[in-house]
A protein has these predicted regions:
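Function-determining sites in protein domains
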Residues: 2-157
Length: 157
């Protein structure tokens, strides 16, 4: 009798854990992955800053209606991990950053803004993203973002 009761408790706990894991996966997909993939990219620019954080150059890659996921994915692929140090006397050079803004709120601000520096430093902020600043494994983030962007490109065709 006691063994049967233990078995029922074990099965119940296992079932509850499985349901929780499924809920977490569904929530992750619905809240995090899907909205990002379905967001329209509203702006992207390539920024070069010196080691003190001063802006050297900023070139807009795309703005508003001219954006396509294919173009931004190609540009991201070409500009990220490119060592393009601006020569400076006695200076260690400059870092390239690529900023991509997804979506747009009523006040014209992007829902999510992701800035990737060539040294692997990532900043994510915006109304639909928790403010986040981290040193990330650059290749993994680059791959994940490119997949999201290419997935959006497939939907646009």
């Amino acid at each position: 009798m006691m063994r049967k009761k233990e078995k029922v408790i074990t099965m119940t706990v296992t079932l509850i854990l499985v349901v929780i894991l499924i809920c977490i996966k569904v929530t992750h997909f619905v809240i995090i992955e899907r909205p990002l993939k379905q967001c329209r990219i509203v702006s992207a620019y390539h920024l070069t800053v010196d080691t003190n954080g001063a802006q050297i150059d900023q070139s807009w890659l795309f703005e508003k209606d001219d954006l396509t996921y294919i173009d931004i994915a190609k540009t991201f692929e070409q500009t990220y991990f490119v060592t393009d140090y601006a020569g400076g006397s006695g200076d260690s050079g400059a870092l390239n950053e690529l900023t991509i803004a997804f979506g747009e709120t009523m006040d014209g601000m992007p829902d999510i803004r992701i800035t990737v520096s060539e040294n692997g430093y990532i900043q994510i902020n915006g109304k639909r993203a928790c403010p986040l600043s981290l040193k990330y494994a650059g290749n993994r983030l680059y791959g994940h973002l490119l997949e999201c962007l290419q997935d959006g490109a497939d939907r646009q065709q």
